């Protein structure tokens, strides 16, 4: 029997199919599937984030990855699939779906960034790290609609025309703004929006999780910039427990009988055969005691179905009729995740011990890949990261809301399975991991704190909106967003400096936030519990390398 816990609600070149593998696996003898008890999740602090959990026999847990998408792969699909993905399909709307500060506080938000960039350039120049003939590159990853680039370049151009000292002119002569985005639709929009900048702006299509594949090693002197980009990295959904176990979520979609009856009459024959075939394979492997009716979707059949549905006018109603289940298996099923948990077992254990409860958390492995790539391409300069997130304590402490959110036209929710392919899905950034991964590749933390500290050391007066924007539609809400900018605890600023930059510049030493776990502040019982959890967690995930 399938046990449901509750009733609550890619990169383009990726090959999702696994037909041959499914058939090969089916050749092995099948074990009986007795009715399974529903996992006891009462000790999970934020158990409401677990959606329609079902179980498989322990002997089959390691096979789940061969049939179903991990939660991370599901997120990758619905955001970036070339036909069904929210970003790649061009459905994204930066005004209706959500607001970002480069839009709501434009152009003053970008002007603060521009002044910080000027100070970094000036510090490198005075220290001799940047020569007068060197190019100074502003490389933005996840440029979205290109508003950040447009406003920054506009400010730099205006400043060099007004400045009598000649410094801004020197920067303008050296600067090149290069934007990278994985969405072809966003690349096209940026190119049009920034066409007035001429040769000062370039936009290129590329995946930010692998910067070293886009840019030659050691070729950049300047600033690596991102605003609300890391939060879009796809994440593994993980349950961390006080007993030291770690479980990762896989997504098992099903077509209820009524929905399959509708789709069967309309779907292409090849898709019908794929769904029927993989449903039989999945039932035989995991759920052969289940009554027939609903159709189980494998990784391959779900992707094929979603891409076909995306072409239909009634896509929203159809995709919302799919029932999504989650299957949790030991995290060692994904070796890269197991390696991450092993390397960061200590801080995870400390925060679990402080909480005294199991917890659902979201882990991005791409944060580390991004920082590794940035460390390789940046010869000298800075990394300026603006995003919402927290340190170890904040990222594991369950808030009244989920650390994962979904944004679409006129709404925000925490259900990633609603309106699949029609919404953005974002997750709070673990800045402690970003900083640690940066240090490992020569990027030292110069500042970490609240986003409002971006204004530090700049002459920008946020209370003085430019006269030409007083009649703009967003200007009427400007003060509301300004107060949010000043008071928000969620948005953070991380400034990192590449080693050997030796710039005559330091970020203002203001209200810094700690990045590491304060182990000295732990009470002895909590410290002992943390040591025990760390030992068990390290042992559990170490099995992945055997």
Question: Model-flagged regions — what are they?
Answer:
Residues 1-43:
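N-terminal mitochondrial targeting presequence
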Residues 36-141, 145-221, 238, 467-469, ...:
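Rossmann-like AdoMet
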Residues 143, 229, 386-389:
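Short, well-ordered beta-to-alpha junction loops that form the rim of enzyme active sites
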Residues 150, 234-236, 395-396:
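Short glycine-/acidic-enriched loop or helix-start segments at secondary-structure transitions
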Residues 211-232, 362-376:
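Conserved adenosine/adenylate-binding substructure
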Residues 223-340, 400-407:
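A mobile, often basic/glycine-rich helix-loop segment
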Residues 313-546:
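Long, Lys/Arg- and hydrophobic-enriched amphipathic alpha-helices
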């Amino acid at each position: 029997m399938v046990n449901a816990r509750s009733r609550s609600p890619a990169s383009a070149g990726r090959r999702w199919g696994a037909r041959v593998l499914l058939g090969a696996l089916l050749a092995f003898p099948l074990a009986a599937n007795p009715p399974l008890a529903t996992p006891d999740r009462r000790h999970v602090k934020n158990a409401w984030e677990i959606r329609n959990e079902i179980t498989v026999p322990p002997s089959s847990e390691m096979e789940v990855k061969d049939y179903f998408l991990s939660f991370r792969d599901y997120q990758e699909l619905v955001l970036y699939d070339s036909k069904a993905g929210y970003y790649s399909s061009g459905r994204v709307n930066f005004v209706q779906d959500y607001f970002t500060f480069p839009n709501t506080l434009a152009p003053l938000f970008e002007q603060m960034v521009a002044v910080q960039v000027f100070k970094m350039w000036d510090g490198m120049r005075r220290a001799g790290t940047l020569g007068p003939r060197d190019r100074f590159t502003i490389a933005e990853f996840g440029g979205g609609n290109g508003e950040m680039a447009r406003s920054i370049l506009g400010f730099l151009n205006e400043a060099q025309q007004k400045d009598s000292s000649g410094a801004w002119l020197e920067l303008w002569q050296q600067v090149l703004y290069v934007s990278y985005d994985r969405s072809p639709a966003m690349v096209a929009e940026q190119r049009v929006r920034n066409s007035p900048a001429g040769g000062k702006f370039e936009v290129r299509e590329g995946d930010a999780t692998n910067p070293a594949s886009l840019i030659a090693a050691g070729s950049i002197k300047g600033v690596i910039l991102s605003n609300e980009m890391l939060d879009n990295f796809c994440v593994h959904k993980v349950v961390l427990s006080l007993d030291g176990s770690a479980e990762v979520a896989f997504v098992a979609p099903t077509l209820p009988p009524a929905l399959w009856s509708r789709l069967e009459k309309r779907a292409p024959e090849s898709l019908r055969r794929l769904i029927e075939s993989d449903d039989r394979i999945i039932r035989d492997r995991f759920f052969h005691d289940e009554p027939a009716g609903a159709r189980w979707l494998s990784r391959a059949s779900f992707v094929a179905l979603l891409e076909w549905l995306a072409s239909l006018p009634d896509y929203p109603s159809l995709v919302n009729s799919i029932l999504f289940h989650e299957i949790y298996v030991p995290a060692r099923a994904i070796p890269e995740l197991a390696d991450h948990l092993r390397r960061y077992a200590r801080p995870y254990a400390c925060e679990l011990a402080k909480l005294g409860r199991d917890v659902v958390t979201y882990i991005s492995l791409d944060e580390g890949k991004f920082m590794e790539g940035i460390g390789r391409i940046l010869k000298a300069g800075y990394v300026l990261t603006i995003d919402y997130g927290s340190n170890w304590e904040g990222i594991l402490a369950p808030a009244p809301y989920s650390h994962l959110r979904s944004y679409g036209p006129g709404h925000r929710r925490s259900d990633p399975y609603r309106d699949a392919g029609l919404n953005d899905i974002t997750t709070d950034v673990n800045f402690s991991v970003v900083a640690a991964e940066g240090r490992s590749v020569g990027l030292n933390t110069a500042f970490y704190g609240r986003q409002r500290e971006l204004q530090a050391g700049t002459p920008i007066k946020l209370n003085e909106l430019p006269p030409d924007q007083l009649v703009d539609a967003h200007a009427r809400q400007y003060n509301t967003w300004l107060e949010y900018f000043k008071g928000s605890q969620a948005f953070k600023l991380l400034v990192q400096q590449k080693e050997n930059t030796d710039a005559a510049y330091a970020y203002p030493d203001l209200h810094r936030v700690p990045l590491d776990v304060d182990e000295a502040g732990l009470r002895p019982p909590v410290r002992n519990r943390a040591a025990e959890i760390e030992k068990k967690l390290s042992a559990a995930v170490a099995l992945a390398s055997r």
